[in-house]
């Protein structure tokens, strides 16, 4: 259902993509598109709400990438569990890691919400540290990847007609893998080892856990 979007003025219908005109407008200002709900799965939402956060993320990411924007995001809810971390990792690199050339579609940045005492306790902190390593593809931080540079001046004004042309035709979003190729693992394997967490792909069934997060910027995903 797109009732909430239409009520808010977003005419994001079956034949119209109302996020891509926003992305096109942002290109004039050399801006990044920062979106939310990166940790959410469809199966965690109430069926009565007819909510599909995974498909929404796909659509918004794709709209931004098609317009040449850098995409950044954050988690909407405080989460500590590997299921949420693995959803974020899948959305950070929808096609996984490309070992032969730079990854075409990946996040430019990620804000993790939020710092709490619960995050720093026991397994929650272990999960978080592993998640940060996975966001870096298990590589050490390279400060030269995103050097600090002066902001660019905004470009010429884009006519509203040109902005609105981006809404139609509505293109299919770029495909996302069902799972991340670098998951955060759950404890519980044979002899106390690690096993992959229950996950499921887009629309898959998972068990939601009590959760939390941290306020701070992680460097761009590899």
From Swiss-Prot:
Protein name: Beta-amylase
EC number, UniProt record: 3.2.1.2
Active site, per annotation: 74 (proton acceptor)
Biological process per Gene Ontology, one example term: polysaccharide catabolic process
Keyword Hydrolase: yes
Similarity comment: family membership: Belongs to the glycosyl hydrolase 14 family.
Pfam families referenced in this protein's UniProt entry, alphabetically: Glyco_hydro_14
EC class of the enzyme, as a word: hydrolase
Organism: Secale cereale
InterPro entries xref list: Glyco_hydro_14, Glyco_hydro_14B_pln, Glycoside_hydrolase_SF
Keyword vocabulary terms for this entry: Carbohydrate metabolism, Glycosidase, Hydrolase, Polysaccharide degradation
Signal peptide: none
Keyword field contains Transport: no
Catalytic activity: Hydrolysis of (1->4)-alpha-D-glucosidic linkages in polysaccharides so as to remove successive maltose units from the non-reducing ends of the chains
Disulfide linkage: none
Binding residues for substrate: 36, 75-76, 114
GO MF annotation terms: beta-amylase activity
């Amino acid at each position: 259902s797109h009732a909430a979007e239409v009520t808010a003025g977003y005419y994001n219908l079956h034949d119209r993509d109302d996020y891509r005109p926003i992305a096109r407008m942002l290109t004039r200002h050399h801006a990044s598109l920062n979106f939310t709900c990166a940790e959410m799965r469809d199966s965690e939402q109430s069926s009565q709400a007819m909510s599909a956060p995974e498909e929404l993320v796909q659509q918004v990411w794709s709209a931004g990438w098609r317009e040449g924007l850098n995409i950044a995001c954050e988690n909407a809810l405080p989460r500590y569990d590997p299921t949420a971390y693995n959803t974020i990792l899948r959305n950070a690199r929808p096609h996984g890691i490309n070992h032969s050339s730079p990854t075409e579609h990946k996040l430019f940045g990620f804000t993790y919400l939020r710092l709490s005492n619960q995050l720093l306790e026991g397994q929650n902190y272990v999960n978080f540290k592993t998640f940060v390593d996975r966001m870096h593809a298990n590589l050490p931080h390279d400060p030269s990847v995103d050097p600090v540079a002066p902001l660019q001046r905004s470009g010429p004004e884009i006519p509203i007609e040109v902005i609105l042309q981006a809404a139609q035709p509505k293109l299919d979003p770029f495909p996302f893998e069902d799972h991340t190729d670098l998951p955060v693992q759950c404890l519980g394997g044979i002899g106390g080892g690690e096993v992959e967490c229950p996950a499921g792909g887009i629309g898959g069934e998972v068990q939601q856990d009590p959760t939390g997060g941290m306020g701070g910027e992680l460097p761009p995903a590899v």
